[in-house]
Amino acid sequence: MSVLSILNYPNKKLRKIASNISLIDSEIKSLIKNMLETMYFNEGIGLAATQVDVHKRIIVIDISKNKNKPLILINPVFINKCGAQTFEEGCLSIPKKTAFVNRSKKVKIKAINCLGEEFLLKSKGLLATCIQHEMDHLIGKLFIDYIKPLKN
């Protein structure tokens, strides 16, 4: 496994739209392992393939205290969103910057795991926020896009 280079804002590649994965082969599995290593090395809780300059719909997340419960989401799609919550967010592609972002409190998604099996996932709280943040990366959106400009 290896630590991958993370694209930093304002790199225009962060705005690219990711494409679906049609086959989960050894190359994709290797990418996922490297993404996890990169996320853990950089002390993040989520990473989208877009952030490592691979424009595929892959997300890795681990919000566990001991960093031992990785969640892999391939081709994730929102099924439902409800409620509202605000979390202070940061991003490995925008180092040392944070902002409070309003997002849905609960989300339900459909995704594929590393074995190619489709599954549904309901989440709330921090996990729901993390999923929404990382899924934004797949459509070229960053958390700073939610920040309203200051008024004079």
Swiss-Prot record:
Known cofactor(s): Fe(2+)
Signal peptide: none
Catalytic activity, as annotated: N-terminal N-formyl-L-methionyl-[peptide] + H2O = N-terminal L-methionyl-[peptide] + formate
InterPro entries referenced in this protein's UniProt entry, alphabetically: Peptide_deformylase, Peptide_deformylase_sf
Protein keywords: Hydrolase, Iron, Metal-binding, Protein biosynthesis
Record-linked PANTHER family: PEPTIDE DEFORMYLASE
Stored NCBIfam families: pept_deformyl, PRK00150.1-3
Family: Belongs to the polypeptide deformylase family.
Descriptive protein name: Peptide deformylase
Provenance organism: Wigglesworthia glossinidia brevipalpis
Biological classification of the source: Bacteria, Pseudomonadati, Pseudomonadota, Gammaproteobacteria, Enterobacterales
Gene this protein is translated from: def
